[in-house]
Curated annotation (Swiss-Prot):
<feature type="binding site">
    <location>
        <position position="103"/>
    </location>
    <ligand>
        <name>S-adenosyl-L-methionine</name>
    </ligand>
</feature>
<feature type="binding site">
    <location>
        <position position="55"/>
    </location>
    <ligand>
        <name>S-adenosyl-L-methionine</name>
    </ligand>
</feature>
<comment type="similarity">
    <text>Belongs to the methyltransferase superfamily. RsmH family.</text>
</comment>
<dbReference type="GO" id="GO:0071424">
    <property type="term" value="F:rRNA (cytosine-N4-)-methyltransferase activity"/>
</dbReference>
<keyword id="KW-0808">Transferase</keyword>
<dbReference type="InterPro" id="IPR002903">
    <property type="entry name" value="RsmH"/>
</dbReference>
<dbReference type="InterPro" id="IPR023397">
    <property type="entry name" value="SAM-dep_MeTrfase_MraW_recog"/>
</dbReference>
<keyword id="KW-0489">Methyltransferase</keyword>
<dbReference type="InterPro" id="IPR029063">
    <property type="entry name" value="SAM-dependent_MTases_sf"/>
</dbReference>
<comment type="function">
    <text>Specifically methylates the N4 position of cytidine in position 1402 (C1402) of 16S rRNA.</text>
</comment>
<protein>
    <recommendedName>
        <fullName>Ribosomal RNA small subunit methyltransferase H</fullName>
        <ecNumber>2.1.1.199</ecNumber>
    </recommendedName>
</protein>
<dbReference type="GO" id="GO:0070475">
    <property type="term" value="P:rRNA base methylation"/>
</dbReference>
<keyword id="KW-0963">Cytoplasm</keyword>
<feature type="binding site">
    <location>
        <position position="81"/>
    </location>
    <ligand>
        <name>S-adenosyl-L-methionine</name>
    </ligand>
</feature>
<dbReference type="Pfam" id="PF01795">
    <property type="entry name" value="Methyltransf_5"/>
</dbReference>
<dbReference type="GO" id="GO:0005737">
    <property type="term" value="C:cytoplasm"/>
</dbReference>
<feature type="binding site">
    <location>
        <position position="110"/>
    </location>
    <ligand>
        <name>S-adenosyl-L-methionine</name>
    </ligand>
</feature>
Length: 313
């Protein structure tokens, strides 16, 4: 079924270039998806190069296994990039990786396939899990969460200003029958939204918040960034593409913190080893955005932000 839905890789050339790939280098693609970045990176690697891909999505893993069968330099692992530290240590690669790429968010095939339950535009089962075999679905959360919990998810993760109003409408309606379909939930949210933003579906922010919560996306990102830093060799590159302000803020603060030194906010007279004050990352250039040409070809790239850093120690 995944072959039906096309995915256009965002910031493809820019991301691969930012990794500054060496022919014999070892690289991690923490968000394999449909393999756009991985295939482009493999083209830059020589016979001694290695690429390890991660993804939670079973359909992405199928694509990854096909690529691994074609190219012996590539290996795919069905794990969240939050767990890349465990995988890297198990393979004896900690501190030896030359570059890590994280392309965050949900892919076009996931959004466009109604059966995955991510979209408010196409009716399908209310699921939203990147890996349908793990965790609770969006329908289960909506069925069991309190009104306050639902409102918090919409407000904190979706940045939805009418979160309380929407949560109240959901709890009232679920007393009659459970929410099982995306269109059903989207309709109730839409009615509860009194001020639609021009050009934006009124369910957009609530669905984003629900998806982020169901998949623990921000928690995974924080763990993944820490693990990526430890996996990198000195001189290795960390390249992260984010798609909304919550993700980008985490990435920006992480890179800034390690570019200043981990003890930057501590009093200088504390008995702390001076090395703690030394930066671990160097920020490379300014944040990059999709070009006008890419925006025309792929409107979903409009919110993409890419940040790049190099490991110093």
């Amino acid at each position: 079924m995944n072959a039906t839905y096309r995915h256009i890789t965002v910031l493809l050339e820019e991301a691969v270039s930012a990794l500054a790939p060496r022919e014999d280098g070892c690289y991690l693609d923490g968000t394999f998806g449909r393999g756009g970045h991985s295939r482009a990176l493999l083209e830059k690697l020589g016979t001694g190069g290695r690429l390890l891909g991660f993804d939670k999505d079973p359909q992405a893993i199928q694509t990854g296994k096909a690529l691994a069968a074609e190219d012996g330099r590539f290996v795919i692992v069905q794990r969240s990039f939050a767990e890349l530290g465990d995988e890297v240590r198990a393979r004896g690669l900690e501190g030896r990786v030359d570059g890590v790429l994280l392309d965050l968010g949900v892919s076009s095939p996931q959004l466009d396939d109604p059966e995955r339950g991510f979209s408010f535009l196409n009716d399908g089962p209310l699921d939203m899990r990147m890996n349908p075999g793990q965790g609770i679905s969006a329908a289960e959360f909506i069925a069991n969460a309190t009104e306050e919990e639902i409102a918090r998810v919409f407000k904190v993760y979706g940045e939805e200003r009418f979160a309380k109003r929407m949560a109240r409408a959901i709890v009232q309606r679920r007393q009659e029958r459970p929410f099982e379909r995306t269109a059903d939930l989207a309709e109730v949210i839409t009615v509860a939204n009194p001020a639609w933003e021009k050009g934006k579906n009124p369910a957009t922010r609530a669905f984003q918040g629900l998806r982020i919560h169901v998949n623990n996306e921000l928690g995974d990102l924080e763990r993944g960034l820490d693990a990526a830093l430890e996996s990198l060799a000195v001189g290795g590159r960390l390249v992260v593409i984010s798609f909304h302000s919550l993700e980008d803020r985490i990435v920006k603060l992480f890179m800034r913190k390690h570019a200043k030194g981990e003890a930057d906010n501590l009093p200088r007279d504390l008995p702390i080893r001076s090395k703690v004050f030394e930066p671990r990352l160097k920020l490379l250039g300014k944040p990059q955005y999709a070009s006008e040409e890419e925006l025309k070809a792929n409107p979903r790239s409009r919110s993409a932000v890419m940040r790049v850093a190099e490991k110093l120690r």
